Amino acid sequence: MSRIGNKTITIPAGCEVTVSDKNEVTVKGPKGTLTRQFSPLIEIKVEGAEVKCVRANEAKQTKQLHGTTRALINNMIVGTTEGFKKQLDIVGIGYRAALQGKVLNLVLGYSHEINYEIEEGITVEVPNNTTIVVSGVDKQRVGEVAAQIRGFRKPEPYKGKGIKYSDEVINRKEGKTAA
């Protein structure tokens, strides 16, 4: 029994959810529109101001998809009404970020600068030269872009230099001691 899948999703005011005959869910909200195709094993019903996911049978795969489908629809509703945000911090002497139009320019101690093209539907802000804020309506794409930016210089465990999530804790290691 999927505890998450059995919960109904309440649709907030200003948000509209429609389900097509091919199990394609479209969520329209004040921040934007998201569309996603779901498995035909899960029936998605919109009843008034609630969305309910009902599984077709008790097979293992159907049970797995039940909770996942409900969580994805909930994330679509939250994204179109509130949006998602990831904050990255740059730690290191001389490490900095700058935004030039739709290109994020990163100086991370390499012999060259890194120019990251920001994709459509994602907003990147640089409040100061050591903080990057990635935001958008699609939770998966926001996390993906933040992970790609972090991947340019992951935080190292000795000095903690690199790009890290603002809520991430870096486990520090002790360096070699002279004998």
Question: What role is predicted for each listed range?
Answer:
Residues 2-147, 151-179:
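N-terminal intrinsically disordered, cationic/polar leader segments
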